[in-house]
C-alpha cells in the first residue's frame, strides 16, 4: 500500500512537471536561450564574422530580437486563451523578458551605441523591482502588471530595435524607455505603500 502511494505520488509529480512545460512556458524557455545568443553575436561579431559585412550582423541580432519579442506576445496570448497559466510561467515570462532586454542593452552599450547611464538606470530599476516584488510577496501584497509596465516593455523593445539597426532616433527612444522604466518602478513602490497603509 505504501509503495503504491509513493509510486502514485511520483507519477503525479512528474505529471505536474510536464503540465507546467506547456507551449507558453516552452516559448519562454526559447526566449531565455535567445538572449545570450544575441548578446554573444553583438559583442563578438567583429572577431568571429570577419568575412561578413558588419551590417549583416546587425540584421541577424535584430532578427533574433524580433523573434524573441514575437514569442513574448504569443506565450502570453496562448496562456490566456488556452487557460495554460502556471506558476512556472509566472516566473519564466518576466525572467525571459528581463534577460532579453538586458542582454540587448548591455551588448549595445559595449558597442558604444547605447548610453551607459541609460543602461545602468534600466539595470538598477529592473534588479531593484525584482527584489522588491519578493518583499511585496512576503508581505502578502500582489500588484498586477500595470499599463505603464506594459508600455515600458514596448518602449524598451522599440529602443533596442532602433539601436540594433542604428536608425536615427534610437537614443531618443532609449531615454523615453528609461523614463517609462523608472515611472513604472515608482508605481510598484506606491502600490506597496498604499497596500501596507490599508492593512
Language-model segments: residues:
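Alpha-helical transmembrane bundles and membrane-interface segments of multipass inner-membrane proteins
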Residues: 2-199
Amino acid at each position: 500500500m505504501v509503495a503504491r502511494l509513493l509510486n502514485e505520488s511520483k507519477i503525479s509529480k512528474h505529471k505536474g512537471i510536464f503540465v507546467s512545460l506547456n507551449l507558453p512556458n516552452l516559448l519562454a524557455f526559447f526566449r531565455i536561450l535567445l538572449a545570450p545568443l544575441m548578446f554573444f553575436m553583438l559583442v563578438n561579431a567583429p572577431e568571429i564574422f570577419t568575412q561578413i559585412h558588419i551590417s549583416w550582423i546587425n540584421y541577424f541580432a535584430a532578427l533574433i530580437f524580433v523573434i524573441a519579442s514575437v514569442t513574448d506576445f504569443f506565450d502570453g496570448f496562448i496562456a490566456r486563451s488556452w487557460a495554460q497559466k502556471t506558476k512556472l510561467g509566472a516566473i519564466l515570462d518576466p525572467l525571459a523578458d528581463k534577460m532579453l532586454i538586458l542582454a540587448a542593452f548591455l551588448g549595445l552599450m559595449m558597442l558604444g551605441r547605447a548610453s551607459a547611464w541609460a543602461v545602468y538606470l534600466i539595470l538598477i530599476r529592473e534588479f531593484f523591482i525584482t527584489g522588491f516584488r519578493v518583499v511585496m510577496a512576503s508581505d502578502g501584497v500582489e500588484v498586477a502588471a500595470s499599463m505603464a509596465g506594459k508600455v515600458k516593455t514596448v518602449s524598451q523593445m522599440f529602443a533596442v530595435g532602433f539601436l540594433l539597426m542604428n536608425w536615427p532616433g534610437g537614443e531618443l527612444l532609449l531615454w523615453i524607455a528609461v523614463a517609462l522604466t523608472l515611472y513604472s518602478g515608482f508605481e510598484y513602490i506606491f502600490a506597496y505603500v498604499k497596500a501596507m497603509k490599508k492593512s
